[in-house]
């Protein structure tokens, strides 16, 4: 039997409403935030995120250059941060815990395609970043991953499996480097 991928018959499972909200968001966010310096305008940015359904704490920090696919699937708790140029591809929910930081250029990816399906159907699973965790610059966090409390994902690491609390991981694929100890 010949194996064959048939994306010509792929069907987008996202609703028309979802697509329209995405279109409006794609226009609104850059227009509402392009003129703001990085350190200013946080209440304004939070307001826009909330208008599009995000659950975001008063002290959460989102840089204007952060890309958020679907605000209604974003929850940010107290003192959490999405830094500059973060790409939050949140087709499924992304939850960022208190005092957690996602550093510049990191990629949070809640969706992929089923490579065993000839139609490559979309598959999704949430990402949870627990309290006091840190995602390093340009790191990749894949769908379905939970980053434990206090864990650190090193710069440019690629995480495909859950990371235990108070653990430092790095590399591709990410491997445990050591336990994180706060002095």
How should these model regions be labeled?
Residues 137-161:
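Beta-rich strand-turn-strand
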Residues 61:
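Glycine-rich phosphate-binding "P-loop"
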Residues 35-46, 64-77, 81-146, 172-173, ...:
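Flexible, glycine/small-residue-enriched loop-and-beta-strand segment within the central core
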